[in-house]
Regions:
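Conserved acidic donor-binding segment of nucleotide-sugar-dependent glycosyltransferases
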Residues: 288-289, 293-300, 309-315
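Carbohydrate-associated surface elements
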Residues: 134, 155
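Short hydrophobic beta-strand element within catalytic cores of glycosyltransferases
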Residues: 273-276
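Conserved donor-binding/catalytic core segment of Leloir-type glycosyltransferases
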Residues: 7, 129, 167-193, 206
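Short alpha-helical donor nucleotide-sugar binding micro-motif in glycosyltransferases
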Residues: 65, 235-236, 243-248
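Aromatic "clamp/platform" in nucleotide-sugar-dependent glycosyltransferases that forms part
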Residues: 256
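Membrane-proximal helix-turn-helix segments that form the acceptor-binding/catalytic region
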Residues: 59-63, 111-128, 137
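A conserved nucleotide-sugar
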Residues: 183-186, 190-232, 239
Length: 355
């Protein structure tokens, strides 16, 4: 039997896109073809160039469809690739909202246009992915037909992200795995560890990833006199991540906005105790001082206090990480969740062919 073919519209280098595509191949036996914008989104010149590229994207996608004849189109982001998927003419279409809302930044002058584009994508799609409950709030506000919405995270590979944690119990071994971008507030994290350093509390802080803030953050670490205790790894292969998480006892993430964080799930799976910003995307999974800690946005002093509290309360941390592992096994297992998603796609294709 010929494999069914899916056209994926989105940035194929992103970890969650790779998870999505690989899961469909593994659990749905789909063949995946891809298309994405080639121009970078950094810098004003590139953004203007990217807008022109987006304007011609429809014709390029139509040509791919004529040649490859996909059975279905899927796309990330309801305000860009999701809109192109809705315009493609292929049925069925599944789109995924990537954040708490894709209408971001919230004060952007292009917001009215983005709303129009998003509403069109929502109406024309056959399935809308909400990778977590927090995403449904903006969908309800946009009057989306919630019968089309599947609330389910893609999940993580629980074999790869095992719970055999071997962090040094004698000191804070903290890890940050978010991109080095302003919205992730790595500077707040560094300032909190400077307070710990001033108090004579031993720690090792590992900051994974790359991004526009790297040189600024390295300079800040020097300015705070903690550069010898902070390890900036740069970008690493995803295969190296589980081991680094397993060598850490505390996971920190301080974003100002969040949809559903696979990074948080990875930390929960590997018995890293999560300390995260107190925002809706994190409140869906973390209860303060129950299975982690929630910190007000940009409050580095509070973060320092809670880091000390969590490290001193060893029994609490042990109970929390055990609870978190059970939670991800029940709710965020990639092999279970991606099978559900792949089966749903087959059903949609069957229904479309029957019409």
């Amino acid at each position: 039997m010929k494999k069914r073919r899916i056209l994926f519209l989105g940035e194929t280098y992103r970890a969650d896109a790779i998870t999505w595509m690989n899961g469909l191949k593994e659990f749905g036996d789909f063949e995946i073809i891809t298309w994405e914008l080639k121009t970078s989104n950094s810098g004003i010149f590139n953004r203007i160039k990217r807008i022109f590229e987006f304007g011609h994207a429809f014709f390029k996608i139509k040509k791919i469809i004529q040649l490859q004849k996909p059975d279905m189109v899927i796309a990330e982001r309801t305000t860009s690739y999701g809109f192109l998927a809705a315009l493609s003419g292929v049925k069925p279409v599944a789109i995924a909202q990537q954040g708490r809302t894709d209408l971001w930044p919230e004060k952007s002058i292009s917001l009215p246009l983005k709303k129009l584009i998003q509403n069109y994508a929502f109406k024309k799609s056959d399935l809308i992915h909400a990778w977590g409950p927090v995403m449904t709030i903006s969908m309800i506000e946009a009057n989306v037909n919630m019968n089309k919405v599947l609330v389910l995270p893609k999940g993580i590979d629980l074999e790869k992200f095992g719970n055999n944690n071997n962090a040094n119990p004698e000191k804070i071994c903290a890890i940050v795995t978010r991109s080095l971008l302003p919205e992730y507030r790595h500077d707040i994290i560094l300032k909190s560890f400077a307070i710990l350093n001033q108090k004579g509390i031993d720690f090792a802080l590992t900051i994974i990833g790359d991004g526009s803030q790297l040189s600024k953050l390295k300079d800040l670490a020097k300015e705070l006199s903690i550069e010898n205790k902070v390890n900036f790894t740069g970008r690493i292969p995803n295969t190296a991540l589980p081991k680094l998480l397993q060598q850490s006892n505390i996971y920190i993430s301080m974003p100002i906005t969040e949809g559903v964080s696979a990074s948080l799930f990875e930390a929960m799976a590997t018995n890293c105790y999560p300390i995260v910003s107190d925002i809706p995307g994190n409140q869906s999974w973390i209860e303060h001082r129950k299975n982690g800690q929630l910190i007000p946005i940009d409050d580095y002093k509070k973060l320092a206090e809670e880091l000390i509290w969590s490290f001193e309360n060893t029994e609490h941390r042990q109970q929390a990480v055990s609870k978190n592992r059970k939670f991800v096994e029940k709710n965020v297992d990639y092999s279970i969740n991606m099978k559900i998603i792949a089966d749903k796609y087959h059903q949609l294709i069957d229904g479309s062919k029957a019409e």
